[in-house]
Swiss-Prot record:
Gene3D superfamilies for this protein: Vaccinia Virus protein VP39
GO MF term set: 2-methoxy-6-polyprenyl-1,4-benzoquinol methyltransferase activity; demethylmenaquinone methyltransferase activity
Name of the gene encoding the protein in the UniProt record: ubiE
Entry similarity comment: Belongs to the class I-like SAM-binding methyltransferase superfamily. MenG/UbiE family.
Biological processes annotated in GO: aerobic respiration; menaquinone biosynthetic process; methylation
Highest taxon above the source species: Bacteria
E.C. number(s) listed in UniProt: 2.1.1.163, 2.1.1.201
Entry protein name: Ubiquinone/menaquinone biosynthesis C-methyltransferase UbiE
Keywords assigned: Menaquinone biosynthesis, Methyltransferase, S-adenosyl-L-methionine, Transferase, Ubiquinone biosynthesis
Length: 253
């Protein structure tokens, strides 16, 4: 069966597998310039806390020893910039994103923060990375893997490009665990976020997709099984903010 016969979800819609990436690209082309502002508004700034927890968990070395981070779907550079500020002189991050508009926002932000020597930007596909085997010490992906058409391929590529002893970290929206909060979260997600997107970016539909895509993503235990199936060891996860997000970890050992 080729991609013309297979289907996948795009939000709550079923679409041909080969079309999903184009649809996702259109979403991020539309919102790139206001993406970081919308993250602040949608999460009341909590995304900053979640990302800081991710980087504290990664704990990049503060020494001069070389440390190479691959930040996939990292477009505007948030994760890489945080890691660069925490790390030592040997640190370098490569931001890999399939969307050129998001990367351009990241490049401009790197210049403004004087981090252009610490963070580089490469256009590429998470399902087929253009990097040699065992070339990175860590792989991060924040709020990006649910947009990948074939998650299993992205996980296999993450494993391939990590060095022995390298760490995989994935921050992604999850399933709310707190009774009562789930209903409030749904109300906010489906009614407020698309209208907020319309007001800030002029695009409600892209944010309706983003909300729907969260509900389609596997629960933490199911996603952890996918990470293990890709070859990772010591797979674990922790939920944050009542289960709104989960931070997944795995090692190439």
């Amino acid at each position: 069966m080729d991609q013309t016969d297979q289907t996948t979800h795009f939000g709550f819609r079923d679409v041909p597998l080969g079309e999903k990436q184009t649809l996702v690209n259109d979403v991020f082309h539309s919102v790139a310039q206001r993406y970081d502002l919308m993250n602040d508004l949608m999460s009341a700034g909590l995304h900053r806390v979640w990302k800081d927890i991710m980087i504290n968990t990664l704990n990049p070395p503060k020494s001069d020893a070389p440390f190479a981070l691959l930040d996939v779907a990292g477009g505007t550079g948030d994760i890489s910039f945080r890691a660069a500020r925490k790390a030592g002189a040997g640190f370098h991050a490569t931001v890999c994103d399939i969307n050129g508009d998001m990367l351009e926002v990241g490049r401009q932000r790197a210049l403004k923060q004087y981090l252009e020597d610490k963070v580089s930007f490469v256009e590429g596909n998470a399902e087929k990375l253009a990097f040699p085997d065992r070339s990175f010490d860590a792989y991060t992906i924040a709020f990006g893997i649910r947009n990948v058409p074939q998650i299993e391929l992205a996980l296999a590529e993450a494993y391939r490009v990590l060095k022995h002893g390298g760490r995989f970290l994935c921050l992604e929206f999850s399933t709310v665990e707190v009774p009562g909060l789930d209903k409030l979260y749904d109300l906010f997600s489906f009614n407020v976020i698309p209208q907020l997107g319309r007001a800030v970016t002029g695009d409600a539909e892209s944010y309706r997709y983003l909300v729907e895509s969260i509900r389609q993503f596997p629960r933490p235990n199911a996603f952890a099984e996918m990470i293990s199936a890709a070859g990772f060891s010591r797979v674990s996860w922790q939920t944050l903010s009542g289960g709104i997000v989960a931070l997944h970890s795995g090692w190439r050992l």
